[in-house]
A protein has these predicted regions:
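Iron-sulfur cluster-binding electron-transfer modules in prokaryotic oxidoreductases
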Residues: 1-297
Length: 297
């Protein structure tokens, strides 16, 4: 069993990305991962908040880092936005002494300190690097044979630097998909932005970006899209009908989390994977891959 401090994040805990949180919980035992939820965690600092109050965002992020440092474990999150915000804060506090001094004052007011000893990691990287594809392959009871999948990395997972993949041409998610028996299709826009929170102030612009992604996946014969980010999943799933109306498209592409795809291949109950939470249903597409693993006695 591998142990980690776990930061669920607001979205995957009780927001639009709740299916990510539920499916994460559903696969950890099979992958021999022990995710110990960080006690008294707060919002990561939020990527939009960074642009309006950088110091405030850093202080919020640093509080989580200080709490995680007490555990002595790597801090793991399933949310790409949380991963980016926490990782960025960690990096800035290492690089800029003046900034760290200001943050230290905020932490001291809460009776905390951060020495800089936490390694922030995305759950996908933990599964890819620490669990490993060979181990995952050995656990597959539902090979996803014939399922054509567009691997969507989004714009944050492997940027600006990445220790486990090529930021210019990532392939790790494609490799994971292949290890589950599915077919990763060619997807030229695999690392393009989904529109992020632009759906609020600039909906038309965001819909254009979402349309480009969906159109690229559909034109390369994808049957579904798999992502590592709750914001990407929300945009591609929740706004797909709006894209249909605006651009007169006909495709209907389910958008799944990588944790859901893993769980399906490992024989986890579809209900436990929260497959019913999506707006674009994957039920018909995935009905052939629902053999459930026998309980271990």
């Amino acid at each position: 069993m591998k142990y980690y401090s776990y930061f669920p994040g607001c979205s995957s805990c009780r927001g639009t990305g709740v299916a990510l949180g539920l499916s994460t919980q559903a696969i950890t035992d099979a992958l021999e991962l022990e995710l110990i939820e960080l006690d008294d965690w707060n919002c990561c600092g939020s990527t939009p908040y960074v642009s309006t109050d950088e110091l405030g965002s850093l202080c919020i992020a640093a509080r989580n880092l200080a709490l995680a440092e007490k555990t002595g474990l790597d801090l793991v999150t399933p949310c790409t936005c949380c991963y980016t915000t926490l990782n960025r804060a960690n990096s800035l506090l290492w690089q800029y002494a003046d900034l760290k001094n200001n943050v230290d004052e905020c932490l001291a007011a809460a009776g905390l300190e951060y020495k800089g000893g936490v390694r922030v990691r995305h759950l996908f990287e933990v599964i890819y690097s620490d669990v490993g594809l060979k181990f995952i392959e050995s656990k597959v009871i539902n090979p996803l044979s014939g399922l054509r999948v567009a691997a969507y990395y989004g714009c944050q997972l492997v940027r600006p630097e990445c220790s486990f993949d090529d930021p210019r041409n990532p392939k790790s998610l494609d490799c994971l998909i292949a290890s589950l028996g599915a077919e990763p299709i060619t997807f030229p826009l695999k690392d393009r932005c989904c529109g992020s929170s632009l759906v609020i102030p600039e909906l038309d612009l965001a819909l254009d970006l979402i349309h480009q992604l969906l159109d690229s996946a559909a034109s390369h014969d994808a049957q579904c899209i798999v992502t590592v980010c709750p914001l990407c999943q929300t945009n591609l799933d929740a706004y797909q009908d709006m894209v249909k109306r605006k651009f007169k498209t006909r495709y209907s592409l389910p958008v799944l989390f990588f944790t859901q795809l893993i769980g399906l291949a490992l024989g986890v109950e579809p209900k436990a994977l929260a497959l019913d939470k999506a707006i674009v249903s994957a039920q018909t597409l995935l009905s052939q891959f629902t053999k459930v693993a026998e309980p271990v006695i």
